[in-house]
Structures are given as C-alpha cells and as structure tokens.
Amino acid sequence: MFSTGTVWKNVAAVRQRAPIIHSITNFVVMNTTANALLAAGASPIMAHAPEEMAEMAGIASALVLNIGTLTKPWVESMMLAGMAARERRLPVVLDPVGAGASSLRTTTALEILEKVRPAVVRGNGSEILALAGAAGDTRGVDSARTAHEAVDGGRALARRYGAVVVVSGAEDVVTDGDALWLVRGGSPLMPRVTGMGCTATVLVAAHVAVAADVLEGAVTGMAAMSAAGALAARRSQGPGSFQVAFLDVLHSLDLVTVRDEVEVVRA
C-alpha cells in the first residue's frame, strides 16, 4: 500500500537528491515544466539537439519524451535519446500528447513504445485509449474520455509494453497491468491551465528517479501533483493566480499537506 509516508518519502528524496530530468518537450510547456521541476527540487535539462542526446543520457536520472509539438527533427532526437536511455537503463516517461488526433502523433508514440519501451506512459483517457487501439475521441490535445473509461485500455497497454500507465483525470488511475491505484485530489482549476498534464509527467519522472520502483514513483508523483493542486486552488482566485500558487505550494509541500489533500487507494 502507498501511504502518506511513502508519498512524503519520495517528495523529500527528490529535494535531497535533485535528480536531473532530461525533457524533450513541447514549446507550450517548456517554461512551465522546468519551473515545476525546480520547485519540486529536481534539476531540469530541456535539450533537444540530436547531436547531444547520448551525452545527456550520461548525466540524466530520467528522460521525459513529450510529443506535444512534433516535427521530424524532434522525433529523431526523441528516438536517439530514448535508445540511449534504454541502453543505460534510465527510466523513460512518455507523454503521448494528442495521440489519436493525428497519424503523426499516434505513429510516433507507438514507435517510442515499441523501440524505447518507456517505464511510464502518462496521458489522458483519450490518448491512452488511442494507443491501446480503441477509439479515444481525442479533441486536439484534450480528452473526451474520463480516466475510468480508459482503465481497461490502460491495463492492456501496460501489459503489452511492460510499462506503468497513468491515466489523468478528475481521479487519476495508475496501473502496471495488474494492480490498479486511484489518486484522489487536485482541483477543477487544473485542466483550465495549459501544461498541467505535462507537469504531472515531469513530476512522475522525478519521483520514478528516486523511488523504490516504477509503480511507486508513478503513484507518488501523481499524489504530489494532486496535493499541490488542491491547496493551490484554495489559495488562488482563478487560472492565472493558480499557476503562481501551484509553484509556491510545490516548493513548500509538506507532510501535512500531503496527508490532508490527497488520498491514494487501491481499487
């Protein structure tokens, strides 16, 4: 069971160890996710030149591949980085932004799954269903499906690729193909701010880098995200002030907030 103590242990470990998270991510969220990693205590590198991918794998603690604003050169960099990480046994977290919305996105995400074998896939319900082979009803990069509607697809995807799958929603779902964990917390304000899903992805990567195992890191990363989001929402007046409050809360996240603002249960 993942207790409050487990979540807090990994929150503290990220601060103590400052894992380097190499993120090849989209233009929309570079600043947002880098600042979130810094607030959590991790160290971001936002490199994407093909020529430096192997070197980045030599210093990183985890790799994030986010397909939000794809171009062919970025796909090349993602594959080079992913293969270098796999060779070094670094955990890779895939964020299949908009999978199902275009053939480029879906094909690229599936290629990463096949060749890189990421440790974690974190997406919304529609993205996960699209990768699992079901009709995901993706609306651009937004989801038309709830996390619970994608449970079966998430389990199938996890079993097929040996990954932990995180399905974000009002209640987050985390599965390794067998066990199913629910993370309850957060705020309705979170989907009103661009980059919150991508932020969850990098926090999962930071937690996986320090956790006892991948499943634990995925669960505690999402729990930290939910706890910070819940408290930040109460301290803000709307989406604009929420962004600032979220970083402040993430930076000062403590055991009491984790205990009071998030619930992790096994389904």
From Swiss-Prot:
Keywords: ATP-binding, Kinase, Magnesium, Metal-binding, Nucleotide-binding, Thiamine biosynthesis, Transferase
Keyword Magnesium: yes
GO molecular function, one term: hydroxyethylthiazole kinase activity
UniProt cofactor(s): Mg(2+)
EC number: 2.7.1.50
List of residues binding substrate: 46, 195
Record: residues binding ATP: 122, 168
Xref: InterPro entries: Hyethyz_kinase, Ribokinase-like
Signal sequence interval, chain numbering: none
Pfam families on file: HK (PF02110)
Catalytic activity line of the entry: 5-(2-hydroxyethyl)-4-methylthiazole + ATP = 4-methyl-5-(2-phosphooxyethyl)-thiazole + ADP + H(+)
Pathway: Cofactor biosynthesis; thiamine diphosphate biosynthesis; 4-methyl-5-(2-phosphoethyl)-thiazole from 5-(2-hydroxyethyl)-4-methylthiazole: step 1/1
The keyword Cytoplasm belongs to this UniProt entry's keyword annotation: no
GO biological process annotation, one example: thiamine biosynthetic process
Function (record text): Catalyzes the phosphorylation of the hydroxyl group of 4-methyl-5-beta-hydroxyethylthiazole (THZ).
Entry's family note: Belongs to the Thz kinase family.
HAMAP family: Thz_kinase
Protein name: Hydroxyethylthiazole kinase
Organismal lineage: Bacteria, Pseudomonadati, Thermodesulfobacteriota, Desulfovibrionia, Desulfovibrionales
